[in-house]
């Protein structure tokens, strides 16, 4: 028993002890599972959680500035998590303890942090994860609610950090997991507010003023125009069941998510995985800072288009494609004419 002085513990020891506390009242012989999160980047999704017990799940996020393609002949200086926009998809289980390590590699000196909408507590964790350049912050959070949640940087001014690319999705599976499907995809919508590029200017500059007006220059899926076209097209086969984890980082607009040519068989609105899903939905609203899970079967081969059905946004980049391969279904979809090419059309390839 220590009566005087200080007990100095390493960060590793403190985290190990904290992990035991957050895992609950465990029997003496029980040792909590520990694993490193298998992070993926859009449109890829980590494999479903196979274990049946809670674990301490390590997540490592690095904030850095990176110039990347935004559209044809347009680059943008993004603020990123792990060098990607959107940031990584994190998959955990309700009852898990999230061990988060956040490193600030932004050489500008700007502070960064993470607000997890899945975390219960002040700032969603942001209040204890704020770090300046070269600093690493870490914390433990027990995940009490299943669902699909946004996470984003919340350092001031928070709207600038979100608008510049610091966001991602975290899936907290229910204890019994989710029903199996054949394919899962990660799609996140966001807006880019930029100044009119000057002649010869390759990198578009961010405009806080355009953000205040809510006039985005681009509305995109997965960080850039055309991310789900060409080589980035989502691929599946007829007869398969598809699940899309869809988020809306905003920072301003509501998304009217729609898949041209299909009906969502099930929609877990606003990322709610506890209530029975809505069924046979044509278009679902996804608020800024929110998410949804949609599931559907593919009966007919062909190209299907993901859009924000606030349809003028298609011209700003909010369109992508899912290609379904398989045998024709003339009992469902038939015509004496072949499909005609849609020259200059943004919603049909």
Give residue spans per PLM region.
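Bacterial Sec-dependent signal peptides at the C-terminal "C-region" and cleavage site
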Residues: 20-32
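Bacterial N-terminal signal peptides
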Residues: 10-23
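Compositionally biased regions
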Residues: 9-11, 26, 336
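N-terminal secretory signal peptides that target proteins for export/translocation
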Residues: 1-7
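Copper-binding active sites and cupredoxin-like electron-transfer domains
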Residues: 29-349
């Amino acid at each position: 028993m220590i009566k005087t002085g200080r007990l100095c513990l390493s960060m590793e020891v403190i985290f190990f002890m904290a992990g035991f506390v957050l895992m609950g009242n465990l029997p003496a012989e029980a040792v909590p599972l520990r694993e490193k999160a298998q992070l993926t980047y859009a449109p890829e999704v980590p494999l479903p959680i196979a274990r049946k017990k809670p674990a301490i799940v390590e997540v490592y996020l690095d904030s850095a500035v990176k110039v990347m393609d935004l559209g044809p002949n347009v680059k943008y200086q993004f603020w990123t998590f792990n060098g990607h926009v959107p940031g990584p998809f994190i998959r955990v289980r309700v009852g898990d303890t999230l061990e988060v390590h956040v490193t600030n590699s932004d050489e500008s000196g700007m502070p960064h942090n993470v607000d997890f909408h899945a975390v219960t507590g002040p700032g969603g964790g942001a209040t204890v994860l704020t770090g300046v350049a070269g600093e690493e912050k870490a914390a433990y959070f027990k995940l009490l609610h299943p669902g699909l949640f946004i996470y984003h940087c919340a350092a001031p001014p928070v709207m600038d950090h979100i608008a510049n690319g610091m966001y991602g999705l975290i899936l907290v599976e229910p204890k019994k997991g989710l029903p199996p499907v054949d394919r899962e995809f990660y799609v996140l919508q966001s807006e880019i507010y930029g100044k009119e590029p000057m002649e010869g200017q390759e990198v578009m500059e961010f405009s806080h003023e355009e953000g205040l007006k809510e006039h985005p220059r681009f509305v995109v899926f997965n960080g850039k125009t055309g991310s789900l076209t060409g080589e980035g097209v989502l691929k599946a086969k007829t007869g398969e069941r598809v699940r899309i984890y869809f988020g809306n980082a905003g920072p301003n607009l509501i998304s009217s998510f729609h898949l041209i040519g299909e009906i969502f068989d099930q929609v877990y609105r606003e990322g709610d995985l506890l209530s029975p899903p809505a069924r046979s939905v044509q278009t679902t609203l996804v608020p800024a800072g929110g998410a949804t899970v949609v599931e559907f079967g593919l009966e007919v081969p062909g190209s299907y288009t993901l859009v924000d059905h606030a349809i003028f946004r298609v011209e700003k980049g909010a369109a992508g494609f899912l290609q379904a391969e398989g045998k024709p279904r003339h009992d469902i979809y038939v015509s004496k004419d072949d499909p005609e090419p849609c020259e200059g059309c943004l919603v049909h390839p």
